[in-house]
């Protein structure tokens, strides 16, 4: 099964459980590292930060449904965690949520002679984001290789 289809299938199973427990399903990833497969579930919540207890609670409930439905053929490790301080920004809703914050955006190839830009996220609309760094740059989302918040403590 293709990875994107597998993640869609897992999201359909996992998202209702995560939301029932009053968390947001921030992001899912399924990766192979050092010969082992990992299903990583990143959770968030509006108020306060994610604790180890939050991750354990979600992990137990999600593990139950994944064991029953068994959407992943390979054996894998389940990891549940917070997106972290320098969280990745993957969806338009992530970019919109963090307008006004400092971000680092890396490009597929180059854009206006640059491979990346660090600056303040100004806008996120219609498959474009605008970042003000060395200069203000309007970036098509298909040119984004990766984007992260730059940490503030």
Swiss-Prot record:
Q: Which GO terms describe its biological process?
A: ribosomal small subunit assembly; translation
Q: Which UniProt keywords apply?
A: Cytoplasm, Ribosome biogenesis
According to its UniProt record, where is this protein located?
Answer: Cytoplasm
- What's an example GO cellular component term for this entry? cytosol
The family database entries (Gene3D superfamilies) matched by this protein are listed as: Ribosome maturation factor RimP, C-terminal domain (2.30.30.180), RimP-like superfamily, N-terminal (3.30.300.70)
Could you confirm whether the keyword Glycoprotein appears in this record? Answer: no
Enumerate the Pfam families for this protein: DUF150_C, RimP_N
Per the record, the coiled-coil ranges are none
Q: What NCBIfam families does the database record attribute to this sequence?
A: PRK00092.3-1
Job description of the protein: Required for maturation of 30S ribosomal subunits.
Q: Which family does it belong to?
A: Belongs to the RimP family.
Please state what the protein is called: Ribosome maturation factor RimP
Source organism per entry reads Clostridium botulinum (strain Alaska E43 / Type E3)
């Amino acid at each position: 099964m293709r990875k994107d289809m597998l993640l869609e299938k897992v999201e359909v199973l996992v998202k209702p459980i995560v939301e029932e427990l009053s968390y947001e399903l921030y992001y899912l990833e399924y990766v192979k590292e050092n010969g082992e497969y990992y299903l990583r579930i990143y959770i968030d919540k509006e108020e306060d930060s994610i604790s180890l207890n939050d991750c354990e609670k979600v992990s137990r409930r999600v593990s139950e449904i994944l064991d029953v439905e068994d959407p992943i053929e390979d054996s894998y490790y389940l990891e549940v965690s917070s997106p972290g301080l320098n969280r990745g920004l993957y969806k338009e809703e992530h970019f919109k949520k963090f307008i006004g914050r400092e971000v680092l955006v890396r490009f597929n190839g180059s854009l206006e002679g640059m491979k990346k830009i660090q600056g303040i996220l100004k806008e996120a609309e219609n498959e474009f984001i605008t970042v003000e760094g060395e200069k203000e740059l309007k970036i098509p989302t298909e040119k984004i290789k990766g984007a992260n918040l730059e940490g503030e403590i």
